[in-house]
Amino acid sequence: MPRVKRGVTARARHKKITDAATGYRGRRKNVFRIAKQAVMRAGQYAYRDRRNKKRVFRALWIARINAAVRQHDMTYSVFMNGMKKAAIELDRKVLSDMAIADKAAFAALVTRIKSVVNAAA
């Protein structure tokens, strides 16, 4: 069996890691053993935070909707319950956007939901 020299593959592997670690501070950017750990940890953080990002944005949308709805003397939970009863299927992202960008349309939506909630009560 012929001897395999691994210089090319080792260099490619090291280069891949050190390229991923560019911009890091200290020895993390150029010492392979330390850079490898830093890149692995960065990947873990990226994986975790791609999931957390969804939670954070949903919380932001809910906070915005709640603030906008409270200006019309209503709470978020009553508003969302009214949305279900009125069979209006707008997601929180769109509602949040509407509350900021198109206040008139949002106000019309709130008045419609108020009428649905008052009719049910």
Curated annotation (Swiss-Prot):
Keyword rRNA-binding: yes
Source species, domain of life: Bacteria
Single annotated GO MF: structural constituent of ribosome
Keywords annotated in UniProt: Ribonucleoprotein, Ribosomal protein, RNA-binding, rRNA-binding
Record has Cell inner membrane as a keyword: no
InterPro entries according to UniProt: Ribosomal_bL20, RIBOSOMAL_L20_CS, Ribosomal_protein_bL20_C
GO-annotated biological processes: ribosomal large subunit assembly; translation
Function comment: Binds directly to 23S ribosomal RNA and is necessary for the in vitro assembly process of the 50S ribosomal subunit. It is not involved in the protein synthesizing functions of that subunit.
Family: Belongs to the bacterial ribosomal protein bL20 family.
Protein name: Large ribosomal subunit protein bL20
Provenance organism: Polynucleobacter asymbioticus (strain DSM 18221 / CIP 109841 / QLW-P1DMWA-1)
